[in-house]
Amino acid sequence: MVAKAVCVINGDAKGTVYFEQEDACAPVKVCGEITGLNKGQHGFHVHEFGDNTNGCMSSGPHFNPLNKEHGAPTDENRHLGDLGNIEAPGDGPTKVCINDSKITLFGENSIVGRTVVVHADPDDLGKGGHELSKSTGNAGARIGCGVIGICKI
């Protein structure tokens, strides 16, 4: 059974990101466009809570139900919400196209109802040596966010 979700991102960064998963064992395809980003890499994560009452700050930490350290999307040891970086061209919208086999739209670890956060700085993927590397990737301020919601199939 196919599952689809959507996230409308607001803040200094704005955009729409779509999620699609063919079944519970398939990777999730994440595609969309985001505007308002400076040229370069920006951390892109799923955070624990779908609460944006205090802007992006109330979305909590990265979604991490398995209690792992922060890492790259290809690392075995990573938060489920660690989707790495998106690359902004600086002269137009940033295209997002990620296939991730750790996140899911099904079951108890579903990302539906949680928040996507776009960060001001690059995610160092847990390898930067900064005190925040193993928790946030030292990705800086939260400049855009939105709650992931179920959408019509």
UniProtKB/Swiss-Prot annotation:
Keywords: Antioxidant, Copper, Cytoplasm, Disulfide bond, Metal-binding, Oxidoreductase, Zinc. It is an enzyme of class 1 (oxidoreductase). Binds 1 copper ion per subunit. Disulfide bonds join 56-145. Cu cation binds at residues 45, 47, 62, 119. It catalyses: 2 superoxide + 2 H(+) = H2O2 + O2. Zn(2+) binds at residues 62, 70, 79, 82. Gene3D superfamilies: Superoxide dismutase, copper/zinc binding domain. Its EC number is 1.15.1.1. Its cofactor is Cu cation; Zn(2+). It is found in: Cytoplasm. One of its GO terms (cellular component) is cytoplasm. GO terms for molecular function: copper ion binding; superoxide dismutase activity. Its main location: cytoplasm. Homodimer. PANTHER family: SUPEROXIDE DISMUTASE CU-ZN -RELATED. Belongs to the Cu-Zn superoxide dismutase family. Destroys radicals which are normally produced within the cells and which are toxic to biological systems. This is Superoxide dismutase [Cu-Zn]. It comes from Chymomyza amoena.
